[in-house]
Structure formats: structure tokens, C-alpha cells
Amino acid sequence: MSDFDEFERQLNENKQERDKENRHRKRSHSRSRSRDRKRRSRSRDRRNRDQRSASRDRRRRSKPLTRGAKEEHGGLIRSPRHEKKKKVRKYWDVPPPGFEHITPMQYKAMQAAGQIPATALLPTMTPDGLAVTPTPVPVVGSQMTRQARRLYVGNIPFGITEEAMMDFFNAQMRLGGLTQAPGNPVLAVQINQDKNFAFLEFRSVDETTQAMAFDGIIFQGQSLKIRRPHDYQPLPGMSENPSVYVPGVVSTVVPDSAHKLFIGGLPNYLNDDQVKELLTSFGPLKAFNLVKDSATGLSKGYAFCEYVDINVTDQAIAGLNGMQLGDKKLLVQRASVGAKNATLVSLPSTINQTPVTLQVPGLMSSQVQMGGHPTEVLCLMNMVLPEELLDDEEYEEIVEDVRDECSKYGLVKSIEIPRPVDGVEVPGCGKIFVEFTSVFDCQKAMQGLTGRKFANRVVVTKYCDPDSYHRRDFW
């Protein structure tokens, strides 16, 4: 055998040997993988048995399943409690924290009107994948509702402090049962002493609205005027008027209704108290407003009112309409459109036959006595300003003009016009006092001078006590 044949035989043997080893390794690896699969299968079987056993133990220990259970892997398991919390609606049908006094529909209406940013309360995702809803701005200090939580208060007592004003309104709110939560409803007070008004800020919109019922309340002798601020914008779905009536408080705003009365033909020199005394002879008033000139502050000769007892409305119309006051005749009727045509058939016929005897200061007619008890001293008001009395020459001219005019009605005995003094509060400064020799002459002067104009100002008159006049007690 040649060397080449020997070499080729050797190669074939080596190849056969390698093929045998490869087949052996494949069979061994296949058996190993099969054993591994069997071991893993047995392990899974054991785990499944353990899980099923543990699940059965948990079901035996747990309470009976309620609604909310679900089927999984052929068995029943309880829904985790934290999943139930995720289902609670917080911001769509329930008012968020800070908006407890607003119904869900009102809250949605405010969102639609742009008064609450719709995106401000949208859930955001944390890096862990959890949904977190931002906390909404609470009502207290919220700029969203600040306009609706403020009230203008006019005609405040001179020199009143912010603390006293806050204490007064907080006390009145509690006494009237108008607070909605413990604590003080008034958060802040701002007073403008120069212009004699203040602004109140409340903690909630509803308490602000209810505080409107105190319009006309007396505070330290002053009838407060309560209004909404000029920048007030009504909130959607919320009432603008209070739902309560505070006994004894006569509001200065008379809302439109079938019971609102118009009183025309009033003498211009009558003030609020005089007209109210005329009207309250039929019953207590719920609201009253004497319309005045914004420039002079004097009456325009007509007013509006509403009675607490609506049943006396027609009686007041029957008793006051056509009444003669001085040189004027009253026109009293319902202010609402169409309501003034309401018939009075159901009223007793004796109403029109009964004269109304009233005691109204400043009036004089067959039914109304003027100025209380007449005296020989007449007080003239709204004629001069204190600064107009500083100049001696101008002062003497005023005295002379008053004397000349009053002498037309009778013999003038004396005239007193208190003048201002620097650093001293002078009693009666700005008023003019005229003493006649008889009460009769003084009455004639009052009739002739009341309602006249002096320096383009309407003259207002009243009687003065002679003893006080002689003591120079001009308060």
C-alpha cells in the first residue's frame, strides 16, 4: 500500500471518529434539555399547587366576597382596596376643597365662564406613573371669587376703626344665623376716612350675599348703605340677593316686585326720616329709597318702598294717593309694570273715608303738622358753608340778606349765624337761626322759606327751642 492510500485511510477513520463523537454529544445535549424541561415542569407544578393552596387558604380566611370581585385564572380574588379609591370622583360632580359652598353645577358653570381655569385641576403624571390632581385654590384669599366676596359700605360713622367695623358685622352675622361655619365670616376691612366708606371682604360668596340683608342697618347712629362693588360680576348659578330678612332693618334698595310702591309728588325739602314716618303709619317698611340728586344730595321728590307685610300695600295706596302735602299732591301706585292697574275692589270702603293723621317734621297741611311744636325761633339749613362765613364782608352781606327776606313775614327780633373758629368745633356752624317776635310770624316764615333757594341751594327749615337758642346751644 502506497503512502497516499495510507494517508487517505487515516483521514476516513478520523472523520468517522469525529462523526461518532458529534452524534454522542447531540444525544447527550438533547437528553439534558429534556431533563431540564421536566425539572422546570415539575417546579411549575409545585408552584401552582402551592399558589392554589395558598389561595384556598386566603379565601377560607377572608370574608365573603362582595360586589367588585372579579374572575382571574379560573378563581375569584378580592379587588384591592386602593383600586376602589381611584374610582372616587373628586372634581366633576363634587365641589373640590375650598369650593364647598358652591354646588357642582355652579362650579362647572364657573369653569365654563372662564372664572376657574379648566386646566388647573387636570391630573398630572409623576415619574412613577401615578396620576396626581393638583389641589385647587381655596375660597379664602382666592382671586377667582374675590369680586363676589367684597361689599361696599357707605355712610359709615366718622372716625370708626376697621376693627370695630369687623367686630360689628361678625357679631351681626352670628346673631342673624347667617354664618355657614365656625369662625368669623369677615376676613378684612378697608376704610376710606376721607370719603366715608369702607370695603368688607368675606370668606365665602354665599355669606357675602347674605350680608346684603344688613343694608340700612343702624351702626352708631348711622344708617349703613351696603352695595356690591363696581367691579362685581355675578357668578353663574348663584343668587345676587339675600334670602333672609333681618327684622328692624330697612334696606335702601327696593327690588322690583309686584309689591314695590312708587311715591311721587313729595316736597323736595323732606328728608328720609320724614318720608319714612309718613309711610310707616301703615306698617313697618322692608325697603325704602328716597331718590336724590347725585350732585346736591337733595330729594328729587319721589321715592320707592316695600312693606314687610305685603297685605298693607293696597291700604297704603288708598290712604296716601292724592294726599295734599303743602302745595303738592301725592301720587302713590305700584311701581311694577302692569301691577299699578290692580283693583282695590276687595278693600273695605272705609279705607278712603278714614283721614290719616300724621306728625311729620317739616310738613304743613290740614293733616300733617310741620316742624313739631311751633316756636318763635326758626332754624334755616343748607344755605351757607362754613368757609363762606370767614370773610367779614361776605358774612355781613349774608346776615343782611337773611334779615331782609325774613322781615317780609314778620318782625325779626334777632339773628345768629355761628362762624367757624380754627381748631374749635363750633356748634351750629353752617346753620342760620332767626328769632321772630311771635310764633305766628315764625310759622309764616317757615311756609314761605321752606324749599326756596339760597345761593343755588334748597333751603331746609325746622323750629328751634327758644331756651336752647338763648343759651346758644346750637347743636
UniProtKB/Swiss-Prot annotation:
PROSITE patterns: RRM. Keywords: Acetylation, Hydroxylation, Isopeptide bond, mRNA processing, mRNA splicing, Nucleus, Phosphoprotein, Repeat, Repressor, RNA-binding, Ubl conjugation. GO terms for cellular component: nuclear speck; nucleus; Prp19 complex; spliceosomal complex; U2-type prespliceosome; U2AF complex. GO terms for biological process: mRNA splicing, via spliceosome; negative regulation of mRNA splicing, via spliceosome; negative regulation of protein ubiquitination; positive regulation of RNA splicing; RNA splicing. The modification Phosphoserine is found at S2, S79, S294. There is a cross-link at K15, K70 (Glycyl lysine isopeptide (Lys-Gly) (interchain with G-Cter in SUMO2)). Interacts with U2AF1L4. Heterodimer with U2AF1. Binds unphosphorylated SF1. Interacts with SCAF11 and SNW1. Interacts with ZRSR2/U2AF1-RS2. Interacts with RBM17. Interacts with PRPF19; the interaction is direct. Interacts with POLR2A (via the C-terminal domain); Interacts with PRPF19; the interaction is direct. Interacts with POLR2A (via the C-terminal domain); recruits PRPF19 and the Prp19 complex to the pre-mRNA. Interacts with KHDC4 (Isoform 2). Interacts with ZRSR2. Interacts with the SF3B complex composed of SF3B1, SF3B2, SF3B3, SF3B4, SF3B5, SF3B6 and PHF5A. Plays a role in pre-mRNA splicing and 3'-end processing. By recruiting PRPF19 and the PRP19C/Prp19 complex/NTC/Nineteen complex to the RNA polymerase II C-terminal domain (CTD), and thereby pre-mRNA, may couple transcription to splicing. Required for the export of mRNA out of the nucleus, even if the mRNA is encoded by an intron-less gene. Positively regulates pre-mRNA 3'-end processing by recruiting the CFIm complex to cleavage and polyadenylation signals. This is Splicing factor U2AF 65 kDa subunit. It comes from Mus musculus (Mouse). The gene is U2af2.
